[in-house]
């Protein structure tokens, strides 16, 4: 096995750990802590700032996952021709990879909506004191949970590869 391949796999796993670990930490540690009454005055601003901070980290690791994923597939002997001819998707390994990539694209799409539309829009509405902000906040929270679950499903598929 090539040292570069092993490094790429290691980097891929590290990026996945940062992505999933950060979402789980936010959901099981940060959000429950901020729900305590003494944090009510700073809750919204704190979550928004954490979201902004995580956004660049999250998109960096997602980009790293895509790049290392492509490199890892290349090291397994597949090229762009295999991708477009359908050869990459043959057999159990290829079908598992296909499902993993579908979920990755779904997570990236949901993350884009969450990070670049819902989060900023919710803050605008909250700053204006509009009642619809709470509904958008709930949708953003739901999407965050959905991304976590989909990311865990991606991890399960990765183990099968």
Regions found by a protein language model. Give the residues of each.
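Polytopic transmembrane helical bundles with strong interfacial aromatic enrichment
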Residues: 1-161
């Amino acid at each position: 096995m090539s040292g570069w391949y092993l490094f790429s796999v290691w980097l891929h796993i590290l990026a996945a750990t940062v992505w999933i670990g950060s979402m789980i930490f936010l959901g099981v540690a940060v959000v429950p802590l901020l729900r305590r009454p003494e944090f009510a005055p700073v809750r919204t601003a704190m979550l928004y700032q954490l979201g902004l901070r995580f956004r660049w980290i999250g998109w960096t690791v997602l980009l790293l996952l895509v790049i290392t994923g492509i490199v890892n597939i290349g090291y397994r002997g597949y090229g762009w021709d295999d991708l477009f001819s359908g050869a990459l998707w043959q057999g159990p390994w290829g079908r598992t990879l296909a499902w993993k990539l579908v979920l990755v694209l779904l997570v990236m799409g949901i993350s884009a909506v969450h990070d670049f539309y819902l989060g900023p829009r919710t803050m605008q509405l909250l700053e204006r004191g509009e009642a619809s902000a709470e509904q958008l906040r709930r949708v953003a929270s739901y999407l965050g949970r959905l991304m976590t679950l989909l990311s865990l499903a991606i991890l399960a598929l990765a183990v099968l590869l």
